[in-house]
Amino acid sequence: MVIETWKKSGIATKFPTYRNSAPVTVHSWQKGKRQDVEAEGLWRIKDGIYDFTEFIDKHPGGTFWIRETKGTDITEAFEAHHLTTAPEKMIAKYKVRDAYQRIYTLTLHEDGFYKTLKERVREKLKTIDKRPKRKSDVSDDL
């Protein structure tokens, strides 16, 4: 049943390895993900393979997540957690090579919905006052 539902979803071109075997654990999910994405023990973002080994201890979000996702496709997480364009520019120096086509059919085209939304949010955030709230200048004289 799970596989049939998945086929109709169109999310990926291949059913994730170990996803339908009991018990499904974080470790079995990661093992299957590592096997499916062919990241060769490195990290995949979009159509590139990256070696973040030297960056692990410098990652502003801490080391845990980077270490745990080694060997997997982190595209969606990378996009969701990095609103500015700085991280995308920074990772270029860690790129090892181009990757094969992703098994996931979710797209992140520059002119697509997600990237357009992200750009609009980025622009809107520039207009928001980031200073601490000021106490009211108005006081009641009782």
Swiss-Prot record:
Pfam families noted in UniProt: Cyt-b5
Gene Ontology CC, one term: mitochondrion
Sites where the protein binds heme: 59, 82
Alphabetized UniProt keyword annotations: Heme, Iron, Metal-binding
Residue ranges annotated for the Cytochrome b5 heme-binding domain, each copy included: 16-100
Tagged with keyword Chloroplast: no
GO MF annotation terms: heme binding; metal ion binding
Keyword match Ribosomal protein: no
SUPFAM superfamilies listed in its UniProt record: Cytochrome b5-like heme/steroid binding domain (SSF55856)
InterPro entries, A to Z: Cyt_B5-like_heme/steroid-bd, Cyt_B5-like_heme/steroid_sf, Cyt_B5_heme-BS, Cytochrome_b5-related
PANTHER family, alphabetized: CYTOCHROME B5-RELATED PROTEIN-RELATED
Role this protein plays: May play a role in muscle cell metabolism.
Membership in a protein family: Belongs to the cytochrome b5 family.
Protein name: Cytochrome b5-related protein
Organism: Drosophila virilis (Fruit fly)
